[in-house]
Amino acid sequence: MDNIEQRVKKIVAEQLGVAEADIKNESSFVNDLGADSLDTVELVMALEDEFGMEIPDEEAEKITTVQQAIDYARANVKA
């Protein structure tokens, strides 16, 4: 597990109140981790803060799983 993956999973755990051990890359924020629409907005904001990036609304709507969040962060974080 790389640094970005660890950071994303830590944020997901903190924002959604789930154990990091229960978070799998294929986990859906809504279906598997119990997030509602407000949770997903707060999750996106936390990811933006953590990685110093801005996620446009149309992109944020496409991020529905842990893996999609990891992939987005990897593609958009400045090294």
UniProtKB/Swiss-Prot annotation:
* The Carrier domain, residue ranges: 2-77
Q: Which GO terms describe its cellular component?
A: cytosol; membrane
- Cite the entry's keywords alphabetically: Cytoplasm, Fatty acid biosynthesis, Fatty acid metabolism, Lipid biosynthesis, Lipid metabolism, Phosphopantetheine, Phosphoprotein
A Pfam family assignment: PP-binding
Its subcellular locations are: Cytoplasm
Processing after translation: 4'-phosphopantetheine is transferred from CoA to a specific serine of apo-ACP by AcpS. This modification is essential for activity because fatty acids are bound in thioester linkage to the sulfhydryl of the prosthetic group.
Q: Which family does it belong to?
A: Belongs to the acyl carrier protein (ACP) family.
Q: What does this protein do?
A: Carrier of the growing fatty acid chain in fatty acid biosynthesis.
What HAMAP family does UniProt report for this protein, alphabetically? Answer: Acyl_carrier
Query: What protein is this chain from?
Result: Acyl carrier protein 1
- The gene behind this protein is acpP1
